[in-house]
């Protein structure tokens, strides 16, 4: 185990981020946590950067009959990425992809309304944006979230997580994203095994953290 819990992991990630990108705090940074666990990570990173904390939600698109297997992901603005190899290997139809995209977008809208709690979506143009999650496995959900943020034309866009798979890092790097991780194990088998406490984060906790962050410095 490398991390006691997500708060500990977030603090370690913040140290790594500041060491890798020392000028980041001077680029009007904003941290976007990926719910649910990434919001706890993001809180610690935002504190270290003196930056506001906000949220971005992306949803995995599950394979037919095996929804735990992601064939892609979709972000709130409709940005969608697909894993072409898996789609082809499973023979997933365009009709199925459109159907599940509509379903997951509806869930995205519901979650964004719940998490945002009436707050406006921040303007990311020209800012340094750090997308924080509690880990990176395949990277498909991160790709959708990052592509969505990229449309907002930030000056700098970084994906940051305490533990990342080598494959996930390569995938994001190949698309031009800066990736910062505390640890990239050669034998990655899952995000949770690197945490002593990887208890599920509730929607209520996410909402409370975001509300508290909203009352802090801009």
Which role does the model predict for each range below?
Residues 1-218:
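PRPP-associated nucleotide enzymes
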